[in-house]
């Protein structure tokens, strides 16, 4: 019963985030009645910030679980060499750092990067052997975050959609790995998404 309550609360929070901010997809049509029991900041920037912090909290819980259950606490050079994941990162040219900050360029890059991460989060959700509820929450809430950020990008054409065949390629890579490497791959995805979101959070705070 407690897990059901937690799940309902988490979903309610995500729906509140989505309905309280203009989104380009179906989420914009969700009922706002779910928002009545939860008080959230009123500005759009704060809503993005709160959602990023929510996702980071879920990632932290998953990483702790991987460390405790699967002994995946640190990266190894062997694992990095064998995982050709090309995970998104933020660089100086992306305009997200205080030096050379450019809001439009930064928003576009964060949105595109998170869309790329969605493919890796499919792997996480389908293959994670621990708390699947938290894994699903990371996947769902990242989708909502993409919609929230994309709605703020002025030139929508600059947001590039990942190649759909990449998902099948990533799944094939994972299936070819032994259990140790599978756990390492999931650990790397979580760690990289955490880093990406932490930099994104800093950028959102100066927008």
Curated annotation (Swiss-Prot):
Signal peptide segment: 1-20
Compartments where found: Secreted
Annotated S-S bridges: 67-73, 96-106
SMART domains in the cross-refs: IL6 (SM00126)
One GO term (biological process): positive regulation of apoptotic DNA fragmentation
Phosphoserine, modified sites: 76
Subunit record text: Component of a hexamer of two molecules each of IL6, IL6R and IL6ST; first binds to IL6R to associate with the signaling subunit IL6ST. Interacts with IL6R (via the N-terminal ectodomain); this interaction may be affected by IL6R-binding with SORL1, hence decreasing IL6 cis signaling. Interacts with SORL1 (via the N-terminal ectodomain); this interaction leads to IL6 internalization and lysosomal degradation. May form a trimeric complex with the soluble SORL1 ectodomain and soluble IL6R receptor; this interaction might stabilize circulating IL6, hence promoting IL6 trans signaling.
Family: Belongs to the IL-6 superfamily.
Name this protein carries in UniProt: Interleukin-6
UniProt lineage: Eukaryota, Metazoa, Chordata, Craniata, Vertebrata
Name of the gene encoding the protein in the UniProt record: IL6
């Amino acid at each position: 019963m407690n897990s059901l309550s937690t799940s309902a609360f988490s979903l309610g929070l995500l729906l509140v985030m989505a309905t309280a901010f203009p989104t380009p997809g179906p989420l914009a049509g969700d009922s706002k009645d779910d928002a009545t029991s939860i008080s959230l900041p009123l500005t759009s920037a704060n809503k993005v910030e709160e959602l990023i912090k929510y996702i980071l909290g879920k990632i932290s819980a998953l990483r702790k679980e991987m460390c405790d259950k699967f002994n995946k606490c640190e990266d190894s050079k062997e694992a990095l060499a064998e995982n050709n994941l090309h995970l998104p990162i933020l660089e100086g040219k992306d305009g997200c750092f205080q030096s050379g900050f450019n809001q439009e360029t930064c928003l576009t890059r964060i949105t595109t990067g998170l869309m790329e991460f969605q493919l890796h989060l499919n792997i996480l959700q389908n293959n994670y052997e621990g708390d699947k509820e938290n894994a699903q929450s990371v996947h769902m809430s990242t989708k909502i975050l993409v919609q929230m950020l994309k709605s703020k990008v002025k030139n929508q054409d600059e947001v590039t959609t990942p190649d759909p065949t990449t998902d099948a390629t990533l799944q094939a890579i994972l299936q070819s790995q032994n259990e140790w490497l599978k756990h390492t791959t999931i650990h790397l995805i979580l760690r990289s998404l955490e880093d990406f979101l932490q930099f994104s959070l800093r950028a959102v705070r100066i927008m």
